[in-house]
From Swiss-Prot:
The protein's name in its UniProt record: Adenylosuccinate synthetase
InterPro entries linked to this entry: Adenylosuccin_syn_GTP-bd, Adenylosuccin_syn_Lys_AS, Adenylosuccinate_synth_dom1, Adenylosuccinate_synth_dom2, Adenylosuccinate_synth_dom3, Adenylosuccinate_synthetase, P-loop_NTPase
Assigned GO CC terms: cytoplasm
General function of this protein: Plays an important role in the de novo pathway of purine nucleotide biosynthesis. Catalyzes the first committed step in the biosynthesis of AMP from IMP.
Originating species: Psychrobacter cryohalolentis (strain ATCC BAA-1226 / DSM 17306 / VKM B-2378 / K5)
Residues noted as binding substrate in the record, renumbered to the chain: A299, T300, T301, G302, R303, A304, R305
Subcellular location: Cytoplasm
GO BP, one annotated term: IMP metabolic process
Keyword Ligase: yes
NCBIfam families: PRK01117.1, purA
One Pfam match: Adenylsucc_synt
Length: 429
């Protein structure tokens, strides 16, 4: 029988999921995205060549791997076609390898306009969205008025679209005081999208299930990170989808008992893009060092990432939320040369009448408890054998394992897929 492996972020995103998915797809027959949209940014480095993917699963570069976009993803057809074009220009046969659920809600021009108008109106209180229409698209889905990919092929598309544009234009022009979205232009776009995407639409749930029954290895690729989950993250500074392992089943239709292994991708320190609380954030030279050496700039937005010490307490919670089987520790090499390393081992909690919130107010109010470990001067860049790691690096890894109650199964020591230590392969676990 094959194995079904989930790969997801365990912090605030940007943990290095793309590289690990690309690495592990050597043993997978299919890779499926199950949530989010083109707000994700997965960077792959293969033989020194960098590819950034926002919507298409990271397995697309592997010959013989089928990539699926599940119903939990909000689909921006214009972004998809642009990404496809870039890959095809580099010789990747995307149309042969990519399949898309007809149940994906579409990100329309009015969603992008709403997203950007809302952020502008919030001023200093902005959430820090990517401005790509993700939130408003999920909003329409939950309100049961979304235009889904399937609607492009149905006779009532024009009526649905006209009603929706009228509804959203009222908000845009009357409340946000910005330009209205043109109906005719949007309808024309929909007709173009239909023809471009037609050959890739499929019943993703059934296709994945048939692969499972045939004993094939499957992979489910998460976007963003656990602490950005709509339910379990630092609300309201979160994304609009279910980022945790539970989102796999709702976002693809593959039931939870069919999932064999959950891998949490985790940086050896902590980063966050945009607004929101960050208990272990650094504002000193060490924070600047992590940002510089770690090249901490968002693949989607280009925004500088905030950097801080490893937060073991936040990760311990992520392990529980996702029932993680193991973690992959990335960017260990960024810590090379630091004399001391601090780990956030817990929080000093404020008095409250409402325990267990774990939202933005909770994380703003806590102060971290730190434990200090000795760093290492040796380079870990490109090491592929655990025994070759500096002794203090091993101590750091073992301490993390003890604090979070989960084994470190993979260690990344550089951006290339080959610069990796695999202690336990998820497909062999």
């Amino acid at each position: 029988m094959g194995k079904n492996v989930v790969v997801l972020g365990s912090q605030w995103g940007d943990e290095g999921k793309g590289k690990i998915v690309d690495l592990l797809t050597e043993k997978a027959s299919a890779v499926a995205r199950f949530q989010g949209g083109h707000n994700a940014g997965h960077t792959l480095v293969v033989d020194g060549k960098t590819t950034v993917l926002h919507l298409i699963p990271s397995g697309i570069l592997r010959e013989g791997v089928t990539c699926f976009i599940g119903n939990g993803v909000v689909l921006a057809p214009d972004a998809l076609l642009k990404e496809m074009k870039g890959l095809e220009e580099n010789g990747v046969p995307v149309r042969e390898r990519l399949r898309i659920s007809p149940n994906c809600p579409l990100i329309m021009p009015y969603h992008v306009a709403l997203d950007q108008a809302r952020e502008a109106k919030r001023g200093s209180g902005k959430i820090g969205t990517t401005g790509r229409g993700i939130g408003p698209a999920y909003e329409d889905k939950v309100a049961r008025r979304a235009i889904k990919l399937a609607d492009l092929f149905r006779d009532d598309l024009e009526e649905k679209l006209r009603n929706l544009i009228e509804y959203h234009n009222f908000q845009l022009t009357q409340y946000y005081k910005v330009e209205a979205i043109d109906f005719d232009e949007t309808l024309k776009l929909c007709k173009e999208w239909k023809e471009e995407i037609r050959g890739m639409v499929t019943d993703v749930t059934e296709d994945l299930n048939q692969l499972r029954l045939a004993g094939k290895n499957l992979m489910f690729e998460g976007a963003q990170g656990t602490l950005l989950d709509i339910d379990h993250g630092t609300y309201p500074f979160v994304t609009s989808s279910s980022v945790t392992a539970g989102g796999v089943s709702t976002g693809t239709g593959i039931g939870p008992l069919y999932l064999d292994y959950v891998l949490g991708i985790t940086k050896a320190y902590t980063t966050r893009v945009g607004s929101g609380p960050f208990p272990t954030e650094l504002f000193d030279d060490v924070g600047a060092h992590l940002a510089k050496v770690g090249h901490e700039f968002g693949a989607t937005t280009g925004r500088a990432r905030r950097c801080g010490w490893f937060d073991a307490e936040a990760l311990r919670r992520a392990v529980v939320l996702n029932s993680m089987s193991g973690i992959c520790l990335t960017k260990l090499d960024v810590l090379d040369g630091l004399e001391e390393l601090l780990i956030g081992v817990g929080y000093n909690l404020p008095e409250t009448e409402c325990a267990g919130a774990h939202d933005a107010e909770f994380y703003e109010a806590v102060t971290p408890k730190y434990e200090t470990l000795q760093g290492w001067s040796e380079s870990t860049v490109g090491i592929t054998n655990y025994d070759e790691l500096p002794e203090n690096a091993k101590i750091y890894i073992k301490r993390i394992e003890a604090l979070i109650g989960c084994p470190v199964d993979i260690i990344s020591t550089g951006p290339d897929r080959e610069e990796t230590i695999v202690l336990r392969d998820p497909y062999d676990a």
